[in-house]
């Protein structure tokens, strides 16, 4: 049976196979098969249905102009993440991208962050799932809970983020307070994980 909407919402963020096992009671083999079935549609066309939240492109540009090192640590397979970022024109802002290999069923967010985090860097992880916040904590860095993303607000706040942003305007104010406010800015694309985490 197809899970209800609340359960499907929980699929956003963690690796897909992990969600199939956790929320649908599948075995690892069944979850791998279900993930393959999902990718039959997602790989050719589904990924193009992403969107970048308002203000994210301007925020990336402003941070880059200030010399910030910008990276993505995502639960999406690395190749898919790179394709999405390139398609939506976000690659020029980024210094690094880390995601699990296509065949990996589990992704440790802390390990993914460490892959893109320069040694002794002062950094912040922006994420919309408790796993993102936990990954930041595992790496000893600050975090911003993107409350406008796909994660459950209560769960996200319970994870103990350093900061929280209700919307992308609040995220801009937090990360780049002197950034010019955007009026009538584009409404097109989405951050790779649904919340502009590409910052």
How should each PLM-predicted stretch be described?
Residues 103-109, 154-156, 174-176:
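Short, charged, surface-exposed secondary-structure boundary motifs
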Residues 7-8, 58, 97, 126:
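Structured catalytic core of nucleotide-sugar glycosyltransferases
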Residues 88-98, 155-175:
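Structural recognition of alpha->loop->beta junctions
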Residues 19, 55, 80-83, 135, ...:
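Phosphate- and divalent-cation-binding pockets in alpha/beta enzyme and binding domains
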Residues 18-28, 49, 57, 61-71, ...:
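Substrate-recognition/cap helix-loop segment adjacent to the acidic, metal-dependent catalytic center
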Residues 177-199:
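Glycine-rich phosphate-binding loop of ATP-dependent small-molecule kinases
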Residues 124-165:
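Acidic, Mg2+-coordinating phosphoryl-transfer loop and its flanking beta/alpha structural elements
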Residues 1-57, 66:
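N-terminal helical cap/lid subdomain that shapes the substrate entry/recognition surface
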């Amino acid at each position: 049976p197809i899970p209800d909407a609340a359960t499907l919402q929980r699929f956003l963020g963690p690796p897909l196979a992990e969600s199939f096992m956790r929320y649908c009671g599948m075995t690892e083999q069944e979850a791998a098969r279900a993930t393959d079935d999902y990718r039959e549609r997602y790989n050719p066309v589904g990924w193009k249905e992403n969107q970048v939240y308002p203000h994210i492109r301007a925020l990336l540009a402003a941070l880059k102009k200030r010399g910030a090192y910008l990276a993505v640590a995502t639960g999406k397979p690395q190749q898919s993440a790179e394709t999405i970022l390139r398609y939506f024109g976000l690659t020029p802002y980024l210094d690094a991208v880390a995601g699990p290999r296509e065949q990996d069923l589990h992704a440790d967010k802390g390990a993914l962050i460490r892959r893109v985090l320069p040694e002794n860097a002062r950094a912040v992880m922006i994420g919309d799932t408790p796993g993102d916040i936990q990954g930041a904590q595992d790496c000893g860095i600050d975090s911003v809970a993107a409350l406008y993303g796909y994660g459950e607000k209560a769960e996200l706040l319970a994870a103990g983020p350093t900061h929280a942003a209700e919307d992308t305007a609040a995220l801009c104010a937090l990360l780049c307070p002197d950034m010019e406010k955007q009026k009538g800015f584009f409404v097109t694309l989405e951050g790779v994980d649904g919340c502009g985490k590409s910052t």
